């Protein structure tokens, strides 16, 4: 039965269901759930209480359970993202570059020393007696990297600001993926289980958007996180990932620490286009003293 006439919920942690059924009978209960908060929620265990054969004793069977629900963050309102979209899309359009598309065959030509052997067409080479390679048409690639900083902006941490920043990241990712733009994410927010920093490599499509939202949903803001300026400085080191000039970087950060501004301005000057979105409460200042560009203010309601 789908009704809850024999169910009681004592609090938000325990739920009691009473069933009476015969041998070889199965009861399926569907429990509606309203998800009001981003995160990973687990049903850690089940207890079955039943009477003995002669109804003179009470038995309890405990069972472990690994069921979990991952609640995606609420994406920021697309209408509020329009000013951000026009700025990001304009930069991404200017930063687009051409790549060979292996699915669009154009023809065959003679092999040169700059060609890869994987492009050699062996059948055509056997017919002509010379090495021949496949040629492909080019396609346009645009890339945006979302830099999500969740460190506190002052002495206190405000959950509303953190959640709004995550919501903005989800909304921007959804908006860009719908435009065919490759999106990646680098955040100092930590995974609820592994405690590793969230990093999603570039990609596009619905599946990739699900990966991004899953990673954002699994962030636990209560876990101590690395200072974001230190993370970005590691990116600038020669032995690590370099700042890519063909990328547009979108920083979402309520924190405007001077060290962070200095590092961001350094990245901006390395031929990297930067858009800084500052979530802030109404009336708060969100200016950047040490950067050569203007931020985008995002009011937290």
Model-predicted segments: where are they?
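An amphipathic, basic-hydrophobic helix/alpha-beta surface used to engage anionic
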Residues: 1-195
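Exposed, interaction-prone extracellular/peripheral surfaces
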Residues: 82, 110-113, 117-301
